[in-house]
């Protein structure tokens, strides 16, 4: 890449199947300079969360969901991170799991908001993925920091489960924090399909939609290169250049 350009790399769930594929993802990121990393949930995680939601969100087994997320991610974490970094990841993961396990009171207070609850609970797949990638990159001595898209200000309209990105507002909210992070030598690791509505409630862009940053790149609003990395075996780049 030319000087001053930033590469955006989006890793899909098929790249995040097990410890081996995850290690290859880390190697790819480690070999880049001036990049933003956008993560999906680990393979099968979102589908499993949806299966837990079933037909009745109000009766979801929150402890069972928490146990699944803990087991799925700790199996991988234990193979790639160690010592104090692993301990910090475990603590941060526990805080997310506590939020899930205590969500029953909110379900009881707002029984009719099925899509709202579904979006909130589904978002943890990507949030934990970002947390684990960030921890693993730090284990390798890299200055990585995790960002949740709804905290950055990825604004959506429409439904909770298939929101539409508000392009202008979102681009204004997120450009400076992310660009400044890269200029300061940081690797921002960001969720891909999570946003928030004008009330600050968690929304999703939909499983078949484009992730939020690609909407911005499509509009040629930022000077970046976008690489979507799909293949589990070869990790072939499929670039779309956005001048």
Please report, for each region that a protein language model flagged, where it lies by residue.
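Nucleotide/pyrophosphate-binding catalytic subdomain
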Residues: 1-243
């Amino acid at each position: 890449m030319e000087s001053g350009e930033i590469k955006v790399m989006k890793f899909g769930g098929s790249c995040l199947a097990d410890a081996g594929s995850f290690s290859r993802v880390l190697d790819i990121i480690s070999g880049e300079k001036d990049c933003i990393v956008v993560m999906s949930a680990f393979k099968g995680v979102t589908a499993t969360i949806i299966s837990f939601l079933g037909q009745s969100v109000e009766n979801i087994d929150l402890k069972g969901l928490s146990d699944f997320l803990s087991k799925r991610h700790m199996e991988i974490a234990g193979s790639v991170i160690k010592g104090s970094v692993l301990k910090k990841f475990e603590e941060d993961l526990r805080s997310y799991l506590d939020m899930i396990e205590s969500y029953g009171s909110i379900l009881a207070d707002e029984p009719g908001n099925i899509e709202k609850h579904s979006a909130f609970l589904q978002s943890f797949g990507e949030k934990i993925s970002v947390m684990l990638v960030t921890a693993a990159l730090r284990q390798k001595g890299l200055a990585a920091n995790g960002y949740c898209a709804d905290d950055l200000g990825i604004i959506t309209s429409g439904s909770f489960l298939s929101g539409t990105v508000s392009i202008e507002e979102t681009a204004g909210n997120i450009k400076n924090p992310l660009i400044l992070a890269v200029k300061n030598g940081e690797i921002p690791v960001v969720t891909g399909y999570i946003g928030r509505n004008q009330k600050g409630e968690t929304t999703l862009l939909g499983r078949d939609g484009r992730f939020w940053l690609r909407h911005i790149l499509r509009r040629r609003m930022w000077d970046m290169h976008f690489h979507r990395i799909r293949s589990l075996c070869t990790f072939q780049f499929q670039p779309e250049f956005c001048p």
